[in-house]
């Protein structure tokens, strides 16, 4: 099956920064979690993540590539057998950056919600997101890096998904297209719930249509229950958490003297 398809059971999401170069109106990052941790503090968090028996780290944010030393952290993680997945909007992922991360990254998940520039702008990604992502897909695949596409389905983009599928049919990626329901938790997402949220039945209807009409695309989907049960996370301020019933359960802080209990033991 190869490393691209190796299943990792102990996964951790690290929202390493809440800073971002986009302003998505569905974003569920914790805006009160901003920090200015240095490399030493981030390395302490990383070592503790590894000590829990973590097999995969999803590097996220905010925009993880805004952290100046994030590649040093990825290098350390890879040295210790971690499967590194980067979730990014791609804006900072030029060819130089791709070459920097290539030895340490296993998968890059590019966030794109539409190939309609006006839709992307209305969601908060800007008019140029389509052009950026198309360029990054090509360059990442040419570099031998696995590429996923992450799409959050909201009222603003649900009618654009067929066009996205047409593009991905003609320009195949080497990973999967992940369609996710809008997750109404924390500041921005919670505030915009009414104007964004798509009914589950409507979501499943378009997902099933896409899977039927575009069998050549590896389409997967995630509902809210799956999203919040997926795996534990570490906030930018070091808080270790799991999410249950749309509420964050803080298990402790990863830079404090008292190490939190192993999150993989939380049911």
Predicted segment positions?
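Canonical Radical SAM [4Fe-4S] cluster-binding loop centered on the CxxxCxxC motif
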Residues: 3-40
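Exposed loop/turn and edge beta-strand positions of beta-sandwich/beta-sheet ligand-binding modules
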Residues: 10, 55, 228
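Short acidic donor-binding/metal-coordinating loop in glycosyltransferase active sites
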Residues: 16, 61-62
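Residue-level recognition of short loop/turn positions
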Residues: 23, 61, 236-238
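Pocket-edge positions in alpha/beta enzyme catalytic cores
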Residues: 34-37, 62, 125, 195
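Radical SAM/AdoMet-radical enzyme domain recognition
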Residues: 39-59, 67-161, 165-179
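Radical SAM enzyme [4Fe-4S]-AdoMet core and its adjacent flexible, acidic
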Residues: 118-231, 236, 241, 245-251, ...
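Cysteine/selenocysteine-centered motifs that mediate thiol-based redox chemistry or coordinate metal-sulfur cofactors
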Residues: 264-267
């Amino acid at each position: 099956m190869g490393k691209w398809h190796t299943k990792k059971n102990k996964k951790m999401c690290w929202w390493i920064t809440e800073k971002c170069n986009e302003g998505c109106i569905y974003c569920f990052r914790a805006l009160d979690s901003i920090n200015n941790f240095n490399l030493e503090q981030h390395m302490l968090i990383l070592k503790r993540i590894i000590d829990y028996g973590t097999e995969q780290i999803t590097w996220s944010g905010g925009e993880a590539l805004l952290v100046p030393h994030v590649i040093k952290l990825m290098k350390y993680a890879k040295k210790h057998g971690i499967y590194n997945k980067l979730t990014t909007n791609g804006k900072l992922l030029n060819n130089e950056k791709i070459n920097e991360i290539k030895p340490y990254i296993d998968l890059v998940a590019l966030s794109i919600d539409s190939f309609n520039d006006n839709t992307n702008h209305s969601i908060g990604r800007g008019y140029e997101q389509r052009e950026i992502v198309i360029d990054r897909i090509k360059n990442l695949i040419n570099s031998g890096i696995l590429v996923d596409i992450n799409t959050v389905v909201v009222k603003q983009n649900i009618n654009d998904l067929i066009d996205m599928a047409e593009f991905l049919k003609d320009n195949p990626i080497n990973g999967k297209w992940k369609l996710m329901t809008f997750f109404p938790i924390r500041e921005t997402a919670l505030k915009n719930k009414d104007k964004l949220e798509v009914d589950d039945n409507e979501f499943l209807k378009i997902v099933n249509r896409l899977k039927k009409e575009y069998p050549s695309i590896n389409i997967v989907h995630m509902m809210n229950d799956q999203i919040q049960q997926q795996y534990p996370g570490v906030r930018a301020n070091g808080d270790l958490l799991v999410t249950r019933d749309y509420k964050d359960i803080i298990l402790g802080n990863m830079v404090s003297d008292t190490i939190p209990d192993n999150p993989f033991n939380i049911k």
